[in-house]
Amino acid sequence: MTEALSRAELREMARESGLDILGVTGPEPFSDAEHYIVDHIERGHTRGMDWFTVARTRESCDPHTLHDTVQSIVSVGIPFWTGLSEPPDDGILRGRIARYAWGRDYHKTLKRRMTALVATIEKIVGRPVEARTLSDTARIVDRAVAARAGTGWVGKNSMIIVPRHGSWVMLGEIMLDIHITPDLPLAQDCGRCRICLDRCPTGAIVEPYRIDAPRCISYLTIEERGPIPFQLRPLLGNRVFGCDTCQDVCPYTSAARPAHDPDFEPVTIENAFPSLERLATMTSADFYATYSGTAVIRAKRSGMARNAAIALGNSDDPHAEPILIQMLRCHDEPLARGHAAWALAHLTGDESHRPLTLALQSEPDPSVCVEIRQALDA
């Protein structure tokens, strides 16, 4: 088959579009990924995610269901490691947001850069191209594409590990009606290393390459819309959006170099290490003013307030007590008030009985009353 575009040309154009990482694979179904994901669902590791179905999995693993004239799939990546690791020592109780969400919403950044690359491809080939750009909002198995395209390999934490960048990489795909000679998968793996399994705060990596999603802090703090299970709350620490632990401890990822990409730098410290007091008390207007245009919006204000309450309860800092009492009395979200009750009891023990009892007398929401009673009985 005649090649309309070489990989070398494509890589150069990708770099000019801000896409530093690139690999190419064909449009064949991702059968191995399909078998693995269906087994994952049947084991119950996606419970709570009703949209994560076998039918959707089969569709996601067959590129022709997404683009019927696809001949090549381009896997692209943007490194996002900033080099910043710890919050400032400023005496403020701060939470921790996963690094990928520090800057602009990565979906929009990927979309913009992939669209620019498609426009350049059309100029080179001299015709309109039937293309579809995808990130993890669309139904395609990003990591299976990246692995087969030689972009990186799948680590035991299920993340794609890219040479020189580790897993600090945003992935996207471009489906093209152009034949490009595919890359070969990388002949590399994690060997005997299992540090990510041993260090996962909640034990969510139940075996190599398999995550029990409802135990994962990323799922709990972002996707879970209701209460977080009691036994997992102390394990969240000060994480209020996502978790980077299995990446932080990875030997490949810890050697990554800063990307210096302005789209992924935090606009302010609040986008990386937010003040827990501010997060616990901010209005809807404040929340959207601070996090609009970032991935944090996905967790919603109620979810972030809930997460802030847990982080305050885990802080072991007496300055958190009045913040939690204020949340318990005044927050307009029942989810936040309920978790503030747990956090207050977790933080202060028997000293929480009086404010909890007073709150119970005036609390109108049955779910919050249940949380308060459980906190009193703890």
Language-model-derived ranges and their functions:
Residues 1-189, 237, 364-366:
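Auxiliary alpha/beta "docking" domains used to position bulky ligands
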Residues 16-19, 29, 195-219, 225, ...:
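Iron-sulfur cluster-binding cysteine motifs and their immediate structural context
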Residues 161-185, 213-232, 284-288:
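Short, charged low-complexity linear segments at domain edges
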Residues 185-195, 205-208, 297:
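Flavin-dependent oxidoreductase catalytic cores
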Residues 268-306:
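Glycine-rich phosphate/pyrophosphate-binding loop
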Residues 286-290, 316-329, 349-361:
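Amphipathic alpha-helical scaffolding segments comprising HEAT/armadillo-like alpha-solenoid repeats
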Residues 298, 302-303, 318, 332-335, ...:
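Alpha-helix N-cap/helix-start positions at coil->helix boundaries
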Residues 305-316, 337-349, 369-378:
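Structural detector for internal amphipathic alpha-helices that build alpha-solenoid repeat scaffolds
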